[in-house]
Amino acid sequence: MAEATKKPADPRTVQLKRVRLSFADSLKDKKPTVKDGVPKHSCNFILESDSPTYEENREKVKKALIAAGEQFNGQPELYKRIMEDDPKRLCYRKGERFKNTEGEVYKGYAGNWAISASGPGGNKNPRRPKLFDRSRKEVPESEILDVCYSGSYADVILSFYGTDTGGLSIFASIEAIRSLQEGERTGGGVYVDASDFDEVDDADDAFEGTSAAGLGVSSAADEDEI
């Protein structure tokens, strides 16, 4: 009997190790990422430059971005074009580009890189990603903010995808988060509303592919080289 053919993994979907959660409150209750936008479950993920997983995570992101561009419009270097023309429409950016309405870089972002992402389903059917605790047990809704809190380190599965809704973009969908339940809480006492988020997170298109199971940029701004 012939062996069953195993479906190859989607190269746009990657697992990142020990990244830090930020703006994690909407993992429990949906919130709009832009003014008057569709409420979604969203979160940012900080890749800390002093982490032992930093370089490996960067390489995974690079490969996923290349695959997303290639599958969207046949351009594996699409992310470079977006980075140069409109960096806010690329979900993976230098930490210094994540600022509040006063133009101040968010605490914990400087010197690092970060990914902004929302749960699967896009605007039409926004859903919460799968959430697990340190022991890989599913997190009850009532405990989400105690387990998947801003500042916690986590292993995450993200899917990157290209879209031209609202402008040429590459976004990321959160498939699953496993909180390691380590790390000091961040964001306490800081007021945050929808205006603090970039419009890039509110696309109509969503990744439709395999679910959870050092990026090189030629940019006019040297500080954006990943």
Predicted regions and their residues:
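Acidic, gly/ser/pro-rich intrinsically disordered tails
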Residues: 1-13, 184-226
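OB-fold ssDNA-binding interfaces and closely related basic DNA-contact patches used
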Residues: 1-120
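Short intrinsically disordered coil segments
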Residues: 59-64, 132-136, 188-200
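OB-fold/S1-family single-stranded nucleic acid-binding modules
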Residues: 164-185
